[in-house]
């Protein structure tokens, strides 16, 4: 059974005294442990769709289920990571990671070793006591990722998490995300404008149309894992990137 299933999802909202049709008849599913990415032009509803799946935003029509259950609001088995790290300046890296544990009223003392292990896993061992202003942008995003993983959610939603980073840092974090995903075997929904990033990371890519966002095509990616950066230099990779660019009308 798919861990995520969307059927006929639409979203309309009022903006500037007029109705905005953000999403129209979106249908897709994701299997357990699958890495699924949404790509499309700005304003096509990628982030809106992600928030609907996460229970952060109501849909206007259609059905969304996670583990066979209708999504009626935020769920404890879903972790979230956004484009900016959204860390509290007055909390250390470790304290920021433990924040959702406190919000969920879990035992922070019991989760502390897990938080330390995750920070080590993302390469931040020794920075547990550092504050956000002492960390680079890439390091802050690693803290944000650790925070999303600390209570072991089954599903991870990532909304352009590396969009503000330089290309070198972005590639390093793509490798980190792949490694962590392969170790932890989460289902990931990922939003990006970067087609190469989508192809590198994904099993399945939803290519979306301009507003109102629809699924233009679902593209499957079958490159074996683990994938290395040099994959991006191959003709096969370039061909798939070009195929998606053609679907988007930017080839």
Residue ranges with predicted function:
Residues 54:
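Helix-to-loop junction immediately C-terminal to a conserved catalytic motif
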Residues 156-159:
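Catalytic Walker B motif of ABC-type/P-loop ATPase nucleotide-binding domains
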Residues 39-41:
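The feature captures the beta-strand-to-loop junction immediately N-terminal to the Walker
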């Amino acid at each position: 059974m798919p861990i995520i299933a969307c059927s006929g999802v639409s979203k309309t909202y009022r903006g500037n005294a007029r109705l905005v049709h953000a999403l129209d008849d979106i249908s897709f599913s994701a299997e357990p442990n699958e890495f699924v990415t949404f790509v499309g032009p700005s304003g096509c509803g990628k982030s809106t769709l992600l928030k609907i799946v996460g229970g952060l935003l109501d849909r206007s029509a259609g059905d969304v289920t996670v583990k066979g259950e209708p999504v009626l609001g935020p769920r404890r088995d879903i972790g979230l990571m956004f484009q900016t790290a959204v860390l509290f300046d007055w909390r250390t890296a470790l304290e920021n990671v433990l924040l959702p544990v406190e919000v969920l009223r879990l035992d922070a003392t019991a989760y502390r070793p897990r938080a330390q292990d995750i920070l080590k896993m993302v390469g931040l061992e020794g920075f547990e006591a550092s504050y956000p202003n002492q960390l680079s942008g890439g390091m802050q995003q690693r803290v944000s990722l650790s925070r999303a993983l600390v209570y072991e959610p089954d599903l991870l939603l990532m909304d352009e998490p590396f969009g503000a980073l330089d290309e070198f840092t972005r590639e390093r974090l793509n490798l980190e995300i792949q490694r962590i995903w392969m170790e932890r075997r989460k289902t990931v929904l990922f939003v990006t404008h970067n087609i190469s990033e989508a192809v590198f990371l994904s099993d399945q890519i939803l290519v979306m149309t301009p507003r109102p966002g629809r699924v233009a095509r679902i593209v499957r990616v079958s490159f074996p894992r683990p994938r290395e950066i040099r994959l991006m230099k191959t003709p096969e990779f370039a061909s798939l990137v070009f195929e998606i660019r053609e679907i988007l009308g930017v080839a």
